[in-house]
């Protein structure tokens, strides 16, 4: 097990976001809260979804904040990101928390064979939070989620947010949870949080 002080030191020393303790996600290490740009607890607070015993996929998980927020509820969860630095941070916190139901992997989502996702599943719900702006294959991922998952927690991002919502609506009933991303400390509020269910 990794001790709290060692985990805190590691996470802080690997933060590449100026002005934040631990980069993109606010993370909890024991009773210590390390401030990040986005607060997963606030981000998921209004989501009316029962994560109990669910199998969760987080595409573009960054430092895993969303999965750590629900680690005590889920059967298992898989986080994927292209950045090995953030995945290493996930694994340090995973070891500290003894969160054996969470796993984190490095993959470039734009070059990954989507069939490889089936190796990690099956999944009840997929998270695709603020990713569409950065993914060339965002439509392919939405279609995969629509075929393979019963639900999707999705945050729009970029100039084509209406198009993202329209594609989700081809697969799911789309409910707007928050019409602005108020948890963002950088005050980038123009994203919508959606719960998509069948």
Residue ranges and their predicted role:
Residues 66, 137-140:
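Extended catalytic core of nucleotide-activated donor transferases of GT-like folds
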Residues 124-137:
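A short SAM/SAH-binding and catalytic strip from SAM-dependent methyltransferases
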Residues 167-198:
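Rossmann-like AdoMet/SAM-dependent catalytic core
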Residues 149-161:
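Conserved beta-strand signature within the Rossmann-like core of class I S-adenosyl-L-methionine
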Residues 144-148:
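Short, conserved loop/helix-junction motifs that constitute active-site signature segments
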Residues 1-73, 77-120, 129, 192:
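Conserved N-terminal segment of class I S-adenosyl-L-methionine
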